[in-house]
Amino acid sequence: METPAVSLLVAVYNTETYIRTCLESLRNQTMDNIEIIIVNDGSADASPDIAEEYAKMDNRFKVIHQENQGLGAVRNKGIEAARGEFIAFIDSDDWIEPDYCEQMLRTAGDETDLVICNYAAEFEDTGKTMDSDIAQTYQDQPKEHYIKALFEGKVRGFSWNKLYRRSMIEAHRLSFPLRGELEHVEDQFFSFRAHFFARSVSYVKTPLYHYRIHLSSIVQRYQKKLFESGLALYETNAAFLQENNKLEEYRKELDTFIVLHSSICMLNEWKTSGSRRLFEKLRNVGVICADPVFQESLSKTGTAPFDAKRSCLLLMAKYRMIPFVAMASAVYQRVIEYKMRNRG
């Protein structure tokens, strides 16, 4: 049996409205030597039936069903099943250009372990599209520049819009954290390590990946234990860098990461979804402000790396002015929600 050039790994969970668009974009790739592995994470809608429908009409599709275990377990299952020289992760509510595999593979050549393409953010609520400029910004920079930008929040740690050489993943035993370990930050955990171990990184300027954004969900959905997850990611990344004798090289960016993440978590408490009472929100904000890792990192970074609004918020957090931090966070979050609703 011929080894596929690319394994496209599709994570599926209750996306019956969008999955056909996704799977059609995979089926219509300009190159045939690919495999498409769909991992259904216990969906309760028609997504599994649609996936099986495609497997019957095209033998490049393979469907794996499992009980709901979370995104990390889904992607790990796909990695285990993959046979391709390269691996790409696709979310089932997104889609890719017909020449995605062809362009990414051509760019990879024989030496590149990681290829990153620009993506088009498709705003579901407004119908607007916004293209990223990752390739233009980082293609002439050493990979360390990208890693530092990842820690500083200048780029997102998405695992999609990338092509990974499977031998690199296997050689370094790369995998995603499981549910309960690093919730909400699985992609950044994996993306950082892939960049760290890649012999070289290449970029494609064309936006080959279409990322569907549901503003009402992303902007307003409360993420439980978000602060704890970020703190755990900070600590595990610091330990990883220490083991590889690189901690001092990235210390400043790591501190920036946890300070930025903490401020995001302050805003998270004031998202409109969820049933938290005012006392609970104030308590959670207080826990963030009092955290010793946050306070120590803030004392090192100061407020210089951040814009004026975030700097003001962090200055109040530094002195644990909890009522003012809460009020500023609530206003800041409402402004973000308003701007996102009226974007474009």
Curated annotation (Swiss-Prot):
Its EC number is 2.4.-.-. It comes from the Bacteria. One of its GO terms (biological process) is polysaccharide biosynthetic process. InterPro entries: Glyco_trans_2-like (IPR001173), Nucleotide-diphossugar_trans (IPR029044). Keywords: Exopolysaccharide synthesis, Glycosyltransferase, Transferase. Induction: Repressed by SinR. GO terms for molecular function: glycosyltransferase activity. Pfam families: Glycos_transf_2 (PF00535). May be involved in the production of the exopolysaccharide (EPS) component of the extracellular matrix during biofilm formation. EPS is responsible for the adhesion of chains of cells into bundles. Required for biofilm maintenance. Belongs to the glycosyltransferase 2 family. This is Putative glycosyltransferase EpsH.
